[in-house]
C-alpha cells in the first residue's frame, strides 16, 4: 500500500506557493490509517523512548494511536492557553509571525525519554521548538519522527544541526 496515495497535495493552501498535504483521506480509510500507524511504529522502534510528545494538532492523532499501539505514554504540546495547569512554554518563529508551544508541567515523570511526533517535517521550526520545550522542562529528547518528510525544504538538515535525530515513514 502506497500511503502517499492517501495524502493528496492541495496547491496554494494555506497560502500561494504552498503544497499542503491533506491527511483526511488517510484518516478516513481504516486500512490506510492502520498501515500508517504500523509503519510509524516500525520507525519508532529505532528509538529507546518511554513517551511520545504529540504536537498540536495532527501530532495528537498519530501520537495517540501510536502510543496505544506501542504501549507508551503520551504528552501533548499545545498552542498557548489551552492547558489548565502551570506550563512550560517555548516561542518559535514562523514565516508569518511568532507562535508558541506549551506542555503542562505535571504531565511527565522525571525519567521520561521523549520521542517527538508530528505529521509532516517541512522546515521545521515546530519540531525544533518542541525539542527546546522538552529540554528546557528538564526531560531527555530521544529523537523525532514524522509520517511525511518534504525533502526539498531541508527540515531534516535543520533538525540535525540542532542535534535532533529524525526518521520519517514517507518522503516527498
Curated annotation (Swiss-Prot):
GO cellular component, one term: cytoplasm
Keyword Cytoplasm: yes
InterPro entries in the record: Ade_phspho_trans, PRibTrfase_dom, PRTase-like, UPRTase/APRTase
Keyword field: Cytoplasm, Glycosyltransferase, Purine salvage, Transferase
Localization: Cytoplasm
GO biological process, one term: purine ribonucleoside salvage
Source organism, top-level taxon: Bacteria
Catalytic activity: AMP + diphosphate = 5-phospho-alpha-D-ribose 1-diphosphate + adenine
GO molecular function: adenine binding; adenine phosphoribosyltransferase activity; AMP binding
E.C. number: 2.4.2.7
Chief place where the protein resides: cytoplasm
Biochemical pathway: Purine metabolism; AMP biosynthesis via salvage pathway; AMP from adenine: step 1/1
Family: Belongs to the purine/pyrimidine phosphoribosyltransferase family.
Role of this protein: Catalyzes a salvage reaction resulting in the formation of AMP, that is energically less costly than de novo synthesis.
Record text on subunit structure and interactions: Homodimer.
HAMAP family: Aden_phosphoribosyltr
Name this protein carries in UniProt: Adenine phosphoribosyltransferase
Source organism of this protein record: Polynucleobacter necessarius subsp. necessarius (strain STIR1)
Amino acid at each position: 500500500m502506497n500511503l502517499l496515495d492517501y495524502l493528496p497535495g492541495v496547491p496554494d493552501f494555506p497560502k500561494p506557493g504552498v503544497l499542503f498535504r491533506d491527511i483526511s483521506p488517510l484518516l478516513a480509510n481504516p486500512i490506510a490509517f492502520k498501515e500508517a500507524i504500523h509503519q510509524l511504529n516500525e520507525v519508532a522502534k529505532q528509538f529507546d523512548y518511554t513517551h511520545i510528545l504529540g504536537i498540536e494538532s495532527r501530532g495528537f492523532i498519530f501520537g495517540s494511536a501510536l502510543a496505544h499501539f506501542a504501549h507508551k505514554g503520551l504528552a501533548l504540546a499545545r498552542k498557548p492557553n489551552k492547558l489548565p495547569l502551570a506550563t512550560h512554554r517555548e516561542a518559535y518563529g514562523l514565516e508569518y509571525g511568532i507562535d508558541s508551544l506549551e506542555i503542562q508541567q505535571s504531565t511527565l515523570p522525571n525519567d521520561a525519554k521523549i520521542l517527538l511526533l508530528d505529521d509532516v517535517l517541512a522546515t521545521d521550526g515546530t519540531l525544533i521548538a518542541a525539542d527546546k520545550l522538552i529540554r528546557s522542562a528538564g526531560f531527555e529528547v530521544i529523537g523525532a519522527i514524522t509520517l511525511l518528510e518534504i525533502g526539498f525544504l531541508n527540515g531534516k538538515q535543520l533538525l540535525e544541526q540542532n542535534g535532533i535525530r529524525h526518521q520519517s515513514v514517507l518522503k516527498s
